[in-house]
Amino acid sequence: MGYGQYERHTRRRCNNTSLTVTIIALVVCLVLALTGFALSLTGAKRAAQELNDKNAQQEARISELEKQLEQSDVNALKEEIERLQKELEKANADKEALQEQINELNRRLEAKQQQNGELAKKKLIALTFDDGPGSRTTPELLDFLKEHNVKATFFVIGINAKKHKDILSRMAAEGHVVGNHSDQHKNLKNLGSVEEIKKAVSECNEIIKEATGEYPVLLRPPGGSTNALVKQACKEMGMSIILWRVDTLDWKSRDKDKILEVAFDKNSPYSIRDGAIVLMHDIYPTTVAAAKEMILRLESEGYTFVTVPQLLQARGGMEPGNVYHYAFPS
């Protein structure tokens, strides 16, 4: 082989070798590229799967929350139904209780009307006692009234009533009526307004309510002094003004015999008669003694002892703000 041929042969071999190397390099690059792509694809698939799993978890959570919300709405509705059911049951119970109260009041009204009709035909007398209660005299008087089944009306002063609430409670418990004689026995006519008059009797009203369970419906102004303002104040407070027909002047004489003499003076138009309201004061021992004899005499003369409201209801009724001295038979 000549040198030229050898050189050409050598160049071809080199070229072939270079081509082979190039091809191998390309193959290696391709393999690496495919491997990287495969890895990337695997990573992408894995990421996609993770995303799908996460989405599935979120969808499951959303579904669970929707179920909880739906159940929550159901529970809320159930609770509301139960609440309304309880309210309905209570309303029905209240209605039944109210109806029973109405029935009871109707029975009492019928009984009162019948009693008033019967009382109206009898000789009636209403004994009233002012300025108490006295710590010793009033309980003694109450003992006698209870013994003889006599009902009376007591007009108490606030400053005294406050000290003897137990006596007021006893009065009410034994069927007597407790009325207001002002807080401090001041002349109500000297007060300049309806509000001042109300203020002058309001504390006594509260004391009576606390002791007896009921607000008084009767006011006896100190000294019997009244005017348009006093009447208006009483009307607004739902109270009737109770004066008297028979003034025994027991506060002045302090003498049992003179008290009885004034009360039964046949020559006086202001002595005891059917329908009269009698004024006395239960803070004096002489008054208590006179009241005992008076009751015995009136019993013998056929009188029925009534409270002021009983007297007025039997003989025409009473209205807030009106003034009453007596209730004579028509």
Regions inferred by a protein language model and the residue ranges of each:
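Active-site beta-loop-alpha junctions enriched in small/polar residues
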Residues: 132, 157-159, 183, 222-224, ...
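Alpha-helical scaffold elements lining the catalytic groove of polysaccharide deacetylases
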Residues: 186-214, 225-274, 287-293
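Long, heptad-repeat coiled-coil alpha-helices used as oligomerization/scaffolding rods
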Residues: 37, 44, 48-51, 55-58, ...
